[in-house]
Amino acid sequence: MLNTARLDNPAVIFDNGSGLCKVGISGEIVPRHVINSVVGHPKFNIPSARSNRKRYFVGEEAQCMYDGLYLHYPIERGLVTRWDDMEKLWKDLFEWELGVKPNEQPVFMTEPSLNPRETREKTTEIMFEKFNVPALYLCNHAVGALCASACITGLVLDSGDGVTCTVPIYEGYSLPRAITKLYVAGRDITEHLTRLLLAKGYTFPCILNKAVVDDIKEKLCTVSWGSKDSEKCYQRSLSEYKLPDGNTIQMSDHLCQVPEVLFTPEHLGIHDLGISKMVCNSIMKCDTDIQENLFAEIVLSGGTTLFPGLQDRLLKELEVLAFEGTPIKITASPDRCYSAWIGGSVMTSLTTFKQMWVTAEDFKEYGAFVVQRKCF
C-alpha cells in the first residue's frame, strides 16, 4: 500500500540537461545544486580517499580528474543515451548532493519536448524500480519555464547546451505539432568559438579546455542587432581574455560572430531556420485564434538565451516577420537558465498538484505506460 503521507513531503525537482543537471527541493527559489551532466569511470586505480566509496565520479569532480577517467555524457541533444550513467548521476544527486532518501519524497522531473515514449517509460521504470520513489511526474521543460513566468499560454524559446526549440503552449499544454527544433545550441557555439580561435593562431594547450572556452563565451560574447551594426559591435566589444596559463587572447569579431549561428545556422552548414523564423513558424502552425496571444507572451529560457543583445535582436526580427501591428512581448528573466526548474518548484508547491502525481500504486497497476496517460 502507498503511504500517502509521503506525497505531502516536499518533492525533489530534477531538471536534466545535456550540459547541466539542476536539482533541489520543491518550494525553494533556485536549485540547491547545479552540476555538469558527466560521469567519469576510472582508467586505472586512483589513489583517492573518495575512490573507496564509489567507483565513478560525476560533475565537476569528474572533469577535474579527466586525465584518469573515461568521461561519458549520458544526455546528448536533450535525450538520454546512456542509461547506466544516467542512473549513476541521479543516485549521486539524491544521496550526495541532496542527502535525501528517494523512497521518502516524490520526484518531479523535466523532460525535453517530443521526448520519445521509450525514454519516458524507461525513466519511469528506473524511478519506481531502482529508486522506489513514492510518486513521479514528468513535465515538458518548456511548460515549466512558462509556469515560472506565471503564464499558462505563450511560446517558449528554449536554448540550452544541446538543442534549441520553440514550443507553443496553450492553457498549460504544449502543442506538439507546432514545436520546432534546431540542433544548434550552447555546445555548438563553444565548438565554433574554439575553431575561430584556433584559426586565429591561438594554439595554447589550455585553450582546448572546454571550460575555458565556455568562460570566454559567457563573459564576452554578444549578439549584434544586424549586419549594419556588426562593425560597431566588433569595435565596441574589443577586449582581452586572460588564459589560466597567463597568456592573453585579443577578442574582436569573435564576440559578435559566434552567437550569430542561432539566427543564421547556415554559418555552421546547417540549413534550418534560425530562432526568429522558428518562433514565427511555430506560431503560424497554431490555430489563428491563439496566434496573437502567443506573439504577446514569448518567454526565453535556457542559458544560451543569456547573450547580451539576443532579446533585442529577436524582437527586431519578429517585428519584421509578423503581421504589421501585431503586439509582441518577450519576457527574459535574469534567472532564465533555471526557468524550468523554478517552474517545477512552483507547480509542486500548489495544493492542486497532488492529484497529478503518478504514484507507485499507479505504476504497480498499469506499468510504465501510465506515464503516457497522466503526464502530457
UniProtKB/Swiss-Prot annotation:
Pfam families from the UniProt entry: Actin
Keywords attached to this entry: Cytoplasm, Cytoplasmic vesicle, Cytoskeleton, Nucleus, Transcription, Transcription regulation
Cellular component GO terms held in the UniProt record: acrosomal vesicle; actin cytoskeleton; cytoplasm; nucleus
InterPro entries, alphabetized: Actin, ATPase_NBD
Keyword Transferase: no
GO MF annotation: an example: chromatin binding
Record localization: Cytoplasm, Cytoskeleton; Cytoplasm; Nucleus; Cytoplasmic vesicle, Secretory vesicle, Acrosome
Function: Negatively regulates the Hedgehog (SHH) signaling. Binds to the promoter of the SHH signaling mediator, GLI1, and inhibits its expression.
Family designation: Belongs to the actin family.
Name of this chain's protein: Actin-related protein T1
UniProt source species: Rattus norvegicus (Rat)
Record lineage: Eukaryota, Metazoa, Chordata, Craniata, Vertebrata
